[in-house]
Amino acid sequence: MIDANVLVEALPYVKEYTNQIVVVKYGGNAMIDEQLKAAVIKDVTLLNLLGVHVVLVHGGGPEINEMLEKTNKESKFLNGLRITDDETMDIVQMVLCGKVNKNLVNLLDKGIGLSGVDGSLFEASCLDSDLVNVGKIEKVNPQIILDTFEKGYIPVVSSVAKAIDKQGTYNINADLAASELAIALHAKKLILLTDVKGLMKDPKDESTLMERVKVSQIPLLKKEKIITGGMIPKIECCVKACREGVESVNIQDGRVMHSLLVELLSNQGVGTLIE
C-alpha cells in the first residue's frame, strides 16, 4: 500500500521546484552500476513529469580509460586532470559525445543529447599547456538548453567545449562544466553525484559526514586537510556556484538509490550542503 504521508511530505518540495532548474553532474558508480543508473533515470524522468527542469552533465572517465586501453594508449593525469593530447582528445569526444551520451539519451523518454560544442554552449581556452587539450570555460551560451526546456526535453550534456583560442575542442572537467552551466542558467540547485557520502572530517569514517558547510569555512577546512585531493576541485566548483547565484549546492552519494528524489522531494537531505 502506498504511504500517503510520503506523498504529502513531497508536496511542498514539488511546489518549490516546479519550473525551476536543477543541474546534476552525473558520474562515478551511478553511471556504471546498472541498478543505480536505472534509479537515476527514473528520478530524472519523474522530476521532469513534475515540471522540474533537470540538466544532466556527464563525464565518462572509466569508459575513456577502457577505450584508451583498447588502443594501447596510457592514461596520464596531472593534478587530477587527464592529460589530453590530440589522439586522446579524439577518443574523449568519441566516448563522451558518442557512446556515453547516446546511451543515456536512449534511456530517457524525453532525453536530448548535446555536447558543449553544440550551439557554442561552452566556449573555452587552454587551462594549462602541460594538459594540452584541457580547457577552462570562458563563456556559457545557455540558450540551447532553454530551448530544450520549452519543448519538454531533458538535456544530457557531455563535457567538451568549443575552443576559442585555436581550431578544435577542449576536454572539460565535468564538475566544472556543471557548475558553470548552473551559474549561467541561474539554477535553483546544483548537485554533484560522487562515490563518497559527501564531505567528511575523516574520509575513512562515514559517521563524520558534514551535512552543512558554509563557504566561509572552506579555507580552514583546506588548511586542516579535511578538504584534500579530488575533493578540492569539487568544493571549488561549489563555492563558485554559491557565490555566483546558485541557490543551493549539494555534494551527495550517487551510490544511494534514488538519492536525487530524496534530496529534492523530502526533508531528509543527502550528502553535504554547501551554502
Identify the residue ranges that each predicted region occupies.
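Nucleotide/pyrophosphate-binding catalytic subdomain
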Residues: 1-255, 268
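Short, basic/aromatic-enriched C-terminal tail that caps enzymatic domains
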Residues: 259-275
